[in-house]
Amino acid sequence: MGRDICTLDNVYANNLGMLTKLAHVTVPNLYQDAFFSALFAEDSLVAKNKKPSSKKDVHFTQMAYYSEIPVGGLVAKLVPKKQNELSLKGIQIEFLGVLPNYRHKSIGSKLLKFAEDKCSECHQHNVFVYLPAVDDLTKQWFIAHGFEQVGETVNNFIKGVNGDEQDAILLKKHIS
């Protein structure tokens, strides 16, 4: 039996640059480099003998490889309790992207399944994502994977790299 052509692996400090590049290619002008470098900021503070903050977010990160070529990535965050009226409790997908030439090969579905599995492991019941309101293609992909829109459009919720603000929608999927 052959091995799977699409595999997932953890993101480490040494391949974080690849995840950052994938994000810039798949969703241009949305993520700053600081967003990704913050994923490993606590590790670098400990290495420099500085005191890490006591409040640490729990992130789950994965890289998707197609025939050993990095083609996609996922950054998800555990939200153990509701922060405000615009948030939910569960696993928030902060970034899920696959290079255009590798879409429709179930790579995104594998990354989403990883987030759903983490949701169950953490005893949570919701996977949710904020999307730009104008991104109908991504919205339809999430809806096809069992997500539904929650509430109305949130004005000026997403801030891009250039400082421009976009309206957002919240999509969620309930995990039993």
From Swiss-Prot:
GO terms for molecular function: protein N-terminal-methionine acetyltransferase activity; protein-N-terminal amino-acid acetyltransferase activity. Residues 14-176 form the N-acetyltransferase domain. It is found in: Cytoplasm. GO terms for biological process: mitotic sister chromatid cohesion. Its main location: cytoplasm. One of its GO terms (cellular component) is NatA complex. Present with 2370 molecules/cell in log phase SD medium. Component of the N-terminal acetyltransferase A (NatA) complex, which is composed of ARD1, NAT1 and NAT5. This is N-alpha-acetyltransferase NAT5. It comes from Saccharomyces cerevisiae (strain ATCC 204508 / S288c) (Baker's yeast).
